[in-house]
Amino acid sequence: PTLDTELRPDGIFVLKLYNFSAISPNLFRNALREFILSGSNKLILDVRGNPGGFLEAAVDMASWFLPAGKVVAIEDYGGNQKPQYHRSKGYDIFGKNLKLVILVNQGSASASEILAGALHEHNIGMLVGEKTFGKGSVQELIPVTGGTSLKVTIARWLTPNGNSISLDGLTPDTVVSMTLEDVEKGRDP
């Protein structure tokens, strides 16, 4: 699945996002509608183990939380060309009443880090879990010969504050690690 939702008995709505595919933004919008209709103002956005996907999906999802024009990510070409700023479309439907926690771990990579980093740096939500993977490179396939190609890094992703995702990943505000015992017993700390 692309995502799962659950309204817990304690009133917290959990949205688990597994990837950033072409259909993810529409499914995310429907999940947010479900969240609003639940009457809760507490949302857990779980991107643990999410390897990423399309940048456009991450920008669209961030747009539900950010005013128009706010930077979601910066594509930095290392001085070879002007940086490209990817900005919120400004759906911004939540305002100040939203209580958002974003769950991350070493399996949160690429578009997961872009979404989590943007929401964190714009003070929309706090990061909880483990340090993320650090996959912040933009790659392009260059044809070589005989049907082979070479994948070349052409740029790197930066958070809205200009921090390199590739260098450090994202460090959570609150570190919570999942132990082997937690996994074996089906517990989610």
PLM-predicted stretches and their roles:
Residues 1-145:
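Cleft-lining beta-strand/loop regions that shape enzyme active-site pockets
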Residues 146-155:
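Short acidic, Pro/Gly- and aromatic-enriched capping/linker segments at domain boundaries
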